[in-house]
């Protein structure tokens, strides 16, 4: 029913509990969303967790259209995607013990990121920010503690067992409560 619009000057705060656990560092997760890019902006963040100027984890747009990068600590991996610059697309970023993959639309064949990443995400409690510098729209954004790729997309659904593994899910359907999950 709704989407969230970013115009490059605002962001959404998902709270400081995402990708952080009292049980220890995360070594796998999925970030998924439907995305419509109005303008490709080098360095725009789909999401980030920063501690001051230090990157905990960040997923952002690259210098050229259809290039994306994932940063964990000081390590960076990149991927070139099919045409994300036009129309609506589903993207699913999966990370498991240093291996990052990107799923686009209904293609169950992942695109592998190039570059070495650590086996775990630093377990730092800091805000999970969505959309910083991003120009476009997001719909049905989620974070899961499982590697799910394109499972359950269109619309995004989760079976009963997977419900307990969803860390956050924003449908953006309530205009009176933006960012409600």
Regions found by a protein language model. Name each.
Residues 9-69, 99-100, 145-152, 164, ...:
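Extracellular glycan-recognition modules
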Residues 1-3, 109, 114, 137-181:
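Extended recognition patches within non-cytosolic domains
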Residues 1-10, 31-41, 56-120:
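Extracellular glycan-interaction surfaces
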Residues 112-137:
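Flexible glycan-contacting loops in extracellular carbohydrate-active proteins
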Residues 25, 82-85, 135:
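Short sequence motifs at beta-strands and strand-loop junctions characteristic
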Residues 30-39, 47, 91-93, 130, ...:
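Short hydrophobic/aromatic patches on beta-strands that form ligand-binding or substrate-lining surfaces
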Residues 12-19, 74-79, 129:
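Short structured motifs
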